[in-house]
Each structure stands twice: as structure tokens, then as C-alpha cells.
């Protein structure tokens, strides 16, 4: 029998067993914990109906998991969820594709809606959508790995839902990323799942990002073909994740 939840906590400090994994904050027969440096290691080991991917910057508690279970029961056909993060300065929410072609955070008071990507620190996926979507692309910057995964889910027929009352406590790492690295990761993520038109809209404002895209276009095309073959994504699904 499958566990109800597996929590994958991702941190570079867990690489190659270089540190003793921390003791889980709590245990339960229906819950598994995995402390890894690569999300895929956790996905491969997971045996739960729902898989939570989290950084060390958020606090996975019993209350959060109980709320997640209630959301799963209320929305049984939903494949993934993007929790809001409650910080000392307010809420941090999921992201949609903005009018400027970039990922933009939804309004703090946004109602229930489908989104393009979660915050990089927390997301929940059903086993069924993980089985259809496959592995996380860890060649992308960490900031875009879950965004890429959620966009690829569209082609597998899955969508990510933002539910305002699904909240987790945390303090996301707001360290500034190198602009060049951000733009490179963003344009590759957009191109893989949404094609040259989405990549081009982003590049209109960040023309140097074309260099990052075309320098690795052959490998990206292989990944894009794998993602979109037999795609179930519709125009309506794409419209729902835009600003």
C-alpha cells in the first residue's frame, strides 16, 4: 500500500552523503522523508500517492500536510499544487507567464486558479503526474527546475493549482541571482515547453538570452521533442496560466 505523502527535502549539503541527514521533524507510518541534493533521487525512491518537494527554507509541518490532504480531497482531479509561503513580510505565491514573457508572481489575494509554476521552495505533485512527466531536468538552474516540470506537466495533461488557503511557513532565499544566469534559465524553460514564440517574447526584452538558447539548441530540441510528443496541452490550458 502506498504511503499518503513523501517529503523530498533538497539541499546541496546532502550531496554524496557528505553530511548526516537531519532527523525528520516528525514521523508517521503514512509519511516518508528523503534528504537529497537532487530531486530525482527522491522521486526514484518515493512510494507515496503525493510527493512534496521542499527546500530547507520552508517548514513542512503536520498542519501543512493535513491542509494538503484536505485540498487533495476537495480537488481529487488536480495533479499538482503550488502552496503559498507565509514569510515575515507577507505571502509569496505561485507564478504565471506575464505579459512581458517572464514568470511573474500572482497577486497576494489571488483566488483559486491554475498557475505556470510554483515558488522554487515548495510544490506538491501526485504520483500519477510524476509517472507521466518523468524526471526533473537538473541541468537547469534550481530556480527553474520546478517551473520546467510544471510546464512539461501540461503536455502530460496535468495542471498546477494555486489554492489560497494552502499555506506553508518559510523564509525563501532571496539572494539575487546573476541576471545572465536567470535569463538563460528562463528562456530555456520557456522554449522547452512553450516553443520559440514564448522564448522570443522573453528575448525581446532580454536579447542576450538568444545566445544562451541557441548555444545549446540541439540538446534542448531533444528534450523539447520528448516533452511535447503526444501533447495533451490545449489552448485553454495555456490561457489559464497566463497573466
PLM regions and their residue ranges:
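N-proximal low-complexity "stem/linker" segments adjacent to membrane-targeting elements
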Residues: 1-22
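Short alpha-helix within the catalytic core of nucleotide-sugar-dependent glycosyltransferases
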Residues: 40, 48, 62-73, 147
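Short aromatic/hydrophobic "clamp" motif used to bind/position activated sugar donors
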Residues: 51
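The conserved acidic donor/metal-binding loop of glycosyltransferases
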Residues: 55-59
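Conserved donor NDP-sugar-binding/catalytic core segment of glycosyltransferases
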Residues: 63-95
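A recurrent flexible, glycine/aromatic-enriched loop bordering the glycosyltransferase active site
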Residues: 105-128
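Donor nucleotide-sugar recognition loop
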Residues: 117-122, 134-151, 155-162, 166-169
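Active-site-adjacent helix/loop segment of glycosyltransferases
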Residues: 159-240
Amino acid at each position: 500500500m502506498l504511503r499518503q505523502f513523501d517529503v523530498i527535502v533538497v539541499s546541496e549539503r546532502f550531496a554524496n552523503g557528505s553530511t548526516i541527514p537531519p532527523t525528520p521533524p516528525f514521523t508517521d507510518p503514512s509519511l516518508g522523508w528523503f534528504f537529497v541534493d537532487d530531486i530525482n533521487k527522491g522521486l526514484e525512491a518515493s512510494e507515496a500517492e503525493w510527493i512534496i518537494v521542499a527546500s530547507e527554507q520552508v517548514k513542512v509541518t503536520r498542519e501543512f500536510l493535513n491542509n494538503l490532504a484536505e485540498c487533495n480531497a476537495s480537488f481529487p482531479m488536480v495533479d499538482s499544487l503550488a502552496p503559498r509561503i507565509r514569510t515575515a513580510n507577507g505571502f509569496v505565491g505561485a507564478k504565471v507567464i506575464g505579459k512581458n514573457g517572464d514568470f511573474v508572481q500572482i497577486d497576494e489575494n489571488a483566488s483559486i486558479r491554475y498557475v505556470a509554476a510554483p515558488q522554487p521552495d515548495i510544490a506538491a505533485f501526485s504520483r500519477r503526474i510524476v509517472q507521466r512527466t518523468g524526471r526533473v531536468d537538473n541541468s537547469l538552474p534550481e530556480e527553474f527546475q520546478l517551473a520546467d516540470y510544471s510546464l512539461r506537466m501540461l503536455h502530460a495533461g496535468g495542471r498546477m493549482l494555486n489554492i489560497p488557503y494552502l499555506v506553508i511557513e518559510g523564509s525563501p532565499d532571496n539572494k539575487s541571482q546573476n541576471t545572465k544566469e536567470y535569463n538563460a534559465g528562463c528562456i530555456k524553460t520557456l522554449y522547452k515547453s512553450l516553443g520559440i514564440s514564448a522564448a522570443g517574447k522573453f528575448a525581446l526584452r532580454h536579447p542576450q538570452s538568444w545566445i544562451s538558447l541557441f548555444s545549446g539548441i540541439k540538446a534542448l530540441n531533444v528534450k523539447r521533442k520528448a516533452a511535447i510528443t503526444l501533447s495533451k496541452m490545449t489552448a485553454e490550458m495555456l490561457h489559464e496560466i497566463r497573466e
